[in-house]
């Protein structure tokens, strides 16, 4: 490559450490380029929602800085316009910094500062500085964690909660549809007293609804922002009123229930609020694991499994066994749940990395929480639309299991006692007879321990599903 070619492909930028060659068409500048060269680790960049949150902060800060006399009006307006474009996703390709970078997220904060400064400079026709103007009254140490909380709050409230409510509604509809489908209950994967399929689906719907409740309970801590605390939580280099004003502006622009941190030192030195949210995401994942596994068990077969329900056939299940169809959506749910559980372990470890006034694993917290929210939101809708809505109950098969379970002997305890009832159950299993047959053959009715009517009432499997 000739010097002339080099000049066409690159330009020279400067920062406090000296000169840096930057791709000629890049909107970023020196500090971003240093980060690109320092962290060629995963190839994973910030989530789109995270870039948007950073840009919303920059736009709001410019507006408030102008109102408080920190920035000239024309500079602030140019920054606001540039930040709006970044928030809309028009410049995502100019955010190349790897997620695995400096633990404060300074590289990504400077990436935002530099891109917005370049765009604002092009608009204004004179220099807009990434630090002096775009980052005015701010520090990476309050901006970056605030951006994580903004992005996560938006993702939880706008994506995940509606998706979970959608799934809960689908499960609730099936609960009503299957209200009279009696089946064998199972504990320890062994036969137990009867339940209805509707009761089971009602339980699944409740699990999902309670997940929404847990998210709602943690939301106030997630929506607290350390913005305005700057370097260490003291608010150094901010004008009076900046913190409250900039958070109010971000809340207005985003429509999110954002509030100023009650204690800026907690809000920058610790990440407990988002660790709590990650724990709620893990709990939801655990619940979805239980639901997905139950669906797989009940649909197992078609000949040698339980076959109490059918799931929709979505795709061929085997490259060698013709006609085989597998429960692909529940399996995808299980993998998402495993990923979310692993993400939470990462977030917990990263959350413990707060030393004195700053947590230094912020980018990896952001990556894992936002990924967990996205995965759970997508897979919840898929589970509802492509599996739950199409489930069909095999009523006769389910009732047959319920009636053949030795545990239906349980209501006879009050007539013949626990020990005699246990003998009946064991004999029924050994001789492959029904409980009713063994009771009659053993003479309990003839001896007057109970009447035939009482026996029939006690062995009504649907009646057993209620107190």
From Swiss-Prot:
Pathway info: Carbohydrate metabolism; tricarboxylic acid cycle; (S)-malate from fumarate: step 1/1
Enzyme Commission code(s) on record: 4.2.1.2
Listed Pfam families: FumaraseC_C (PF10415), Lyase_1 (PF00206)
Entry keyword set: Cytoplasm, Lyase, Tricarboxylic acid cycle
Subcellular location: Cytoplasm
Record-level GO cellular component terms: cytoplasm
One BP annotation, GO: tricarboxylic acid cycle
Protein residues bound to substrate: 104-106, 126, 129-132, 139-141, 187, 319, 324-326
Family the UniProt entry places it in: Belongs to the class-II fumarase/aspartase family. Fumarase subfamily.
Protein name as catalogued: Fumarate hydratase class II
Organism: Streptomyces avermitilis (strain ATCC 31267 / DSM 46492 / JCM 5070 / NBRC 14893 / NCIMB 12804 / NRRL 8165 / MA-4680)
Taxonomic lineage of the native organism: Bacteria, Bacillati, Actinomycetota, Actinomycetes, Kitasatosporales
Gene: fumC
């Amino acid at each position: 490559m000739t010097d002339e070619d080099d000049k066409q492909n690159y330009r020279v930028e400067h920062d406090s450490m000296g000169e840096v060659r930057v791709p000629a068409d890049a909107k970023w500048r020196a500090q971003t380029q240093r980060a690109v060269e320092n962290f060629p680790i995963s190839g994973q960049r910030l989530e789109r929602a995270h870039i948007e949150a950073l840009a919303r902060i920059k736009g709001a800060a410019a507006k408030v800085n102008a109102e408080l006399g920190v920035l000239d009006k024309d500079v602030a307006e140019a920054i606001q316009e540039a930040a709006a474009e970044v928030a809309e996703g028009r410049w995502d390709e100019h955010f190349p910094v790897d997620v695995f970078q400096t633990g404060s997220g300074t590289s990504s904060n400077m990436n935002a500062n530099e891109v917005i400064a370049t765009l604002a400079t092009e608009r204004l026709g004179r220099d807009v500085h990434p630090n002096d103007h775009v980052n005015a009254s701010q520090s990476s140490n309050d901006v970056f964690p605030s951006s994580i909380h903004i992005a996560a709050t938006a993702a939880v409230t706008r994506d995940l909660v509606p998706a979970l409510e959608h799934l809960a509604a689908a499960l609730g509809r099936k609960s009503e549809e299957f209200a009279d489908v009696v089946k064998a209950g199972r504990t320890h994967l062994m036969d137990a007293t009867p339940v209805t399929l509707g009761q089971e689906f009602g339980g699944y719907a409740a699990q999902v609804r309670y997940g929404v409740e847990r998210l709602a309970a943690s939301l106030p801590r997630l929506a607290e922002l350390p913005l305005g605390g700057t370097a260490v939580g003291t608010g150094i280099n901010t004008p009076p009123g900046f913190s409250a004003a900039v958070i109010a502006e971000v809340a207005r622009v985003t429509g999110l229930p954002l509030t100023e941190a009650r204690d800026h030192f907690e809000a920058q030195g610790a990440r407990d609020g988002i660790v709590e949210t990650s724990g709620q995401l893990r709990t939801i994942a655990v619940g979805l694991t239980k639901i997905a596994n139950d669906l797989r068990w009940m649909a197992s077969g078609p000949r040698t499994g339980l076959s109490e329900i059918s799931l929709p056939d979505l795709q061929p299940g085997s490259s060698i066994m013709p006609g085989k169809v597998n429960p692909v959506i529940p399996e995808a749910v299980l993998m998402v749940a495993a990923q979310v559980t692993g993400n939470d372990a990462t977030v917990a470890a990263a959350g413990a990395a707060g030393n004195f006034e700053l947590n230094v694993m912020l980018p990896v917290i952001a990556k894992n929480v936002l990924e967990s929210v996205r995965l759970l939101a997508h897979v919840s809708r898929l589970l509802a639309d492509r599996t739950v809505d199409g489930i069909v109950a095999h009523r006769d098969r389910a009732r047959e299991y319920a009636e053949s379970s030795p545990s239906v002997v349980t209501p006879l305890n009050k007539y013949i006692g626990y020990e005699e009832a246990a003998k009946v159950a064991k004999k029924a299993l050994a001789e492959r007879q029904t409980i009713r047959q063994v009771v009659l053959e053993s003479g309990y009715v003839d001896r007057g321990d109970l009447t035939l009517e009482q026996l029939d009432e006690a062995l009504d499997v649907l009646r057993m599903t209620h107190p």
